[in-house]
């Protein structure tokens, strides 16, 4: 796999999960920052259709609290973009809870288009935390990097 990096971030594949209880395959990457010798968070890419990932999104990320505010989630998404394109995707869905202002800003900085806010269906509620009742859904049109 080609090295995945963007600006101050490098991604390292932590795990590829091919099939778990009927879920689509997914990749888990550690987010590393060049200036720090330990992971600052994680980013996940979930293979599959828009319908499968309408509420969880194709991409999920978390940045550890001490490292927040440095745009690492944004940079990790950008580092992942070419890899996702290489898998045959031209767009992905990214979601966040309506009250997650940091994620909303990250997603909007990527240029993703807001689609709608929807309540999480009751049959999917077990996959989310108790406080997650709705999701803001965004469509991110991927761009091949021009050199």
Question: Which residue ranges define each predicted feature?
Answer:
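Acyl-donor (CoA/ACP) binding surface of acyl/acetyltransferases
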Residues: 1-7, 12-17, 23-147
């Amino acid at each position: 796999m080609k090295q995945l990096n963007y600006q101050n971030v490098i991604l390292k594949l932590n795990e590829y999960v091919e099939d778990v209880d009927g879920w689509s395959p997914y990749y888990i990457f550690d987010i590393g920052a060049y200036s720090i010798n330990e992971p600052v968070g994680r980013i996940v890419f979930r293979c599959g259709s828009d319908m499968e990932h309408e509420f969880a999104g194709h991409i999920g990320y978390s940045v550890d609290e001490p490292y927040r505010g440095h745009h690492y989630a944004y940079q990790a998404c950008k580092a992942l973009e070419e890899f996702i394109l290489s898998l045959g995707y031209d767009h992905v869905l990214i979601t966040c809870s309506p009250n997650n202002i940091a994620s909303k800003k990250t997603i909007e900085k990527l240029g993703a288009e807001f689609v709608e806010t929807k309540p999480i269906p009751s049959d999917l509620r077990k996959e989310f935390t108790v406080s997650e009742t709705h999701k803001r859904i965004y469509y991110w049109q991927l761009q091949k990097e021009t050199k």
